[in-house]
Amino acid sequence: MADLQLTDETPAVADDGVWLACIECGETFAPFAEIRYTCDDCDGLLEARYGDLPTFEDFEGEGVWRYNAALPFEVGVTLPEGHTPLHRVPRLEDEVGVDALRIKHEGMNPTGSFKDRGMTVGVRVAQEVGVDRLACASTGNTSAALAAYGARADLETLVLLPAGKVAAGKVAQA
């Protein structure tokens, strides 16, 4: 496996300080030059790498896009997502023996799922690489998120659901 520790060297393929690196052989690729899922050389998985990693001081604002310093774009296809509340759970704090436990209520996202957090970035990446149609096969939250974010991006979206295998609430959600 390749040594992927941070280095001072940013490869020539880097786009705005970001590149893809194979976790097996270390080969590097431009992040948006073409649609690529695995390494051309060894078929290994690719990892996003940064010349300079952002720090917490680089993050401001709310929602998913407050982390845009660590994302490939300033803003995505947004509904907006990620403005979900944290709830105190004093009884659970006592039970597990911690002083300040919070539970994030991801059901408050636009489609009722944490999947919105990834889909806002994913649909934006699809736009960047020139995709004009989106599709997924899912029985739940992914289908709802793709339907919503695909519609927001005005992209043709196809969601495949197995016959008789999806709860009515999930179909309505999508």
PLM feature spans:
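PLP-dependent amino-acid enzyme catalytic core
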Residues: 2-174
